[in-house]
Amino acid sequence: MAIVLIIIGIIIGAVVKGKDLIRSAEQKKLYNQFLSAWELAYVNYYERTGRILGDTNTPDNSGTRDGRCANDLTLANLEAQLRAVGLDPPAPGPTGSSATRRYSASNGTQYTLTISFRSRSDGTASNYNCIEILGMPTELGIAFDRIKDEEMDGTAGSFIAVSGNGGPRIAWPNVTTSQTVFAARLILGF
């Protein structure tokens, strides 16, 4: 009887561990196909043009440039800027848009993530260009922070959590008490 209970315990442990591995793989796939794809588009645009993607809100790449992402950009504008220099924008996902993705959290809650390019300040540095992600569930933010920065504090490195529009950097909240943060930002190097 004891042997049977031990075997059942091992099987249950393997199932639980398997679910964790599957969730981790889903999070890495979302990071690579969504956030990393836009970061790569930003870097490729800069390497090809010497300019910041989204520095102007005109689709034909004309207009005044100041080295900061314009905060009133549309997805169509970003995609047009990429195509104007021969670059393909990231592929649309299941939502039909390259700027939104859906994520199912471990508790079953569905989230819609939306990215935009912004110039922001969070009180710790001068303005910086970033990819801002709205609708970020805490568990996914922690996973992305770990993937990008190899730590998960939300306040350091290039992937951060913020408390509000222009708000300060914050530590990732406890997943069991706070399911989402206002926004997460991937700080771009230039």
Explain the meaning of each model-derived region.
Residues 23-35:
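Membrane-proximal amphipathic alpha-helices
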Residues 55-190:
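Low-complexity, acidic interaction segments enriched in glycine
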Residues 1-23:
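N-terminal single-pass transmembrane signal-anchor helix
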Residues 36-59, 87-88:
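Alpha-helix exit/C-cap motif
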Residues 29, 49, 53, 155-156:
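Secondary-structure transition/capping residues
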